[in-house]
Amino acid sequence: MDLSAVVEVEELGAKYYDNGVQGDIYDILKNYGVNSVRLRLWNDPYTEDGVPYGAGTNDLEVYKKLAKRAMDHGMSILLDYHYSDFWADPGKQRVPKAWRGMDADQLEQAVYDYTRETLLEMKAAGVLPQLVQVGNELTNGLMWPLGQKPEYDNIAKFVSAGIRAVRSVDSDIPVMIHLDNGGNNPMYVDWFDHYMERGEDFDIIGMSYYPFWHGTMKELETNMRDMADRYGKKIVIAEVSMGFTMEDYAEYEKLGPDDRKGYATKHSLVENLDYPMTPEGQADFMNDIMKLIDDVPGGDGFYYWEAGWIPVPGSGWATEGALSYIEESGPCGNEWANQALFDYDGHALPALKTIRDYKPAHDDLSLIHI
């Protein structure tokens, strides 16, 4: 489970329940079979005046808090380096403020140093991750413009620097390279063919799969099978989610209509989905995703994205300071609450029981990361 925003929403008043009983979200998820937590890391998610960017404000100290709770519950950790001060995805990959003006060689060294130094600090704090992804949704590269696709030499240079840094701290930590759009096989082949010619070896191909953006489940399966066979890598669905309602949650955010973005699952995106946006539809989707991963050779698990990001006043995908950094105009607010695994009041949804009760189709297969 990706739980990166949990500290923020808890501090703003979020509470979680299972069968009507309030509990710690980690306790609840542990009881539903969750064995691994994914946590993002931003370099410096603050304005020059120290105002948080929001969306979890996932700096190193927040990582330590969330990671400690995971380890206390016997969960492993996937660390998600963004190499940015805020969101890094196919639409934006901003260079961290402290690295602006660097050339490609300097950025390569900065990635190595930052990765190594943060991992060593995590190790000293007893929260070294068991799995690391070097970059987030690298479909169009990282640290633009020097690492923007089609600058594959620089993309490989930057990613490889991160991989070398991970290996220097602990050579046994598996490394993931993560792209979005898991149903787009030609894009994956093109990207990894270019990378394999230039970059350091790695262990896992990570995919994002959101059914309202990334094609059919059959297209995802085709891509997973091809990637596992073509490159000999394990496959993890690093981000996945499905909505449980199309009911609005404006009353929970307490924002004006011009100040909130609303949910990402617009009606035009979900009208052709194979699953209804209901608690039952969400549960059925998760059952089928787990079966798909289990059936694909090399399938190694999934991370449900932001399972606990329920709507509370003050928590959203960005603040005004963050918008300035990423050069976007907003509006802000939570756009993911109808895809959490808890309803708007924090009650566990049926999909969690589906995840817990899933039985592998083959005795020698199991979902390692969930």
What are these regions (language model features)?
Residues I368-I370:
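Conserved small/polar residues in nucleotide/adenosyl-binding loops
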Residues M1-I25:
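Boundary/entry segment of secreted carbohydrate-active catalytic domains
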Residues Y53, N58-V62, A88-F202, G215-M224, ...:
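Active-site cleft segment of glycoside hydrolase catalytic domains centered on the general acid/base Glu
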Residues M1, L29, D80, V132, ...:
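Conserved, mostly hydrophobic/aromatic
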Residues I25, D170-P174, P186-D190, H194-E271, ...:
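Glycoside hydrolase catalytic-domain groove-lining segments
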Residues S4-V6, W42-D44, H82-S84, V134-T139, ...:
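Active-site beta-loop-alpha junctions enriched in small/polar residues
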Residues F212, V236-T245, D258-H362:
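Substrate-binding cleft of secreted/luminal carbohydrate-active enzymes
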